[in-house]
A protein has these predicted regions:
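Conserved beta-strand scaffold positions in the cores of enzyme catalytic domains, especially
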Residues: 28-30, 100-104, 153-158
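Pre-Walker A (Motif I) flank of P-loop NTPase domains
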Residues: 1-5, 71-72
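P-loop (Walker A) phosphate-binding loop of NTP-binding proteins
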Residues: 10
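Glycine-rich phosphate-binding loop used to anchor ATP phosphates in small-molecule kinases
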Residues: 52-100
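Conserved substrate/cofactor phosphate-moiety recognition/catalytic segment
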Residues: 13, 17-72
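A glycine- and Lys/Arg-enriched "phosphate-lid" helix/loop adjacent to the NTP-binding pocket
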Residues: 95-146
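NTP-dependent small-molecule kinase module
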Residues: 5, 92, 143-164
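Conserved nucleotide-binding/hydrolysis micro-motifs of P-loop NTPases
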Residues: 35-37, 106-112, 163
């Protein structure tokens, strides 16, 4: 049976890179909340951002339900920063009898800082809407991250040396 893989980790740990790896190697479909948000909305939604992310996540979960029903694995590149967000995803798919596996991605802080620095440089020269994450924003977002418990984590992935 096809399954949903929920990626969890802080900014710049390699979730999107690992999602692309799974897409190639498992023939999975990747659904990204960031990609949907950037294609539909201005990069700054202010106080509406969290509610909009929740709605996008729900929409993509519905698409994932259909893809899994067709027999294809789905990788949710959502970040899944809080226990409540992860619980909501698991509850949704449990109600549809779809297995969910949580992959927690992490890396050394030095690797993460360098990835974010390089990503910001590349994005400043990119066309279209992008998320530039400066150091002060990164610290604020990191403070919101809730480490997943052992009970909710199916796979730990150290991406410090990830080169897929």
């Amino acid at each position: 049976m096809a399954e949903v893989i929920l990626l969890c980790g802080k900014i710049a740990v390699g979730k999107t890179t690992y999602a692309a790896y799974l897409q190639r190697n498992r023939n999975a479909v990747v659904l990204s909340c960031d990609e949907l948000m950037l294609s539909l909305f201005d990069s700054c939604l202010g106080d509406k951002h969290d509610a909009t992310v929740k709605r996008c996540s729900l929409y993509l979960s519905g698409i994932a339900d259909q893809v899994v029903a067709a027999g294809v694995d789905v990788v949710l590149d959502f970040g899944s920063w809080t226990a409540a967000e992860r619980d909501a995803v698991r509850t949704f798919f449990a109600e549809h009898n779809i297995p969910v596996r949580l992959y927690y991605l992490f890396c050394e802080e030095s690797a993460r800082s360098e990835r974010l620095r390089l990503r910001n440089i590349a994005l400043r020269n990119a066309d279209g809407r992008v998320y530039i994450i400066e150091e002060d924003l990164r610290r604020r977002l990191d403070a919101k991250f809730e480490l997943p418990s052992e009970n909710e984590t199916d796979k730990l992935i150290d991406t410090t040396h990830l080169t897929v």
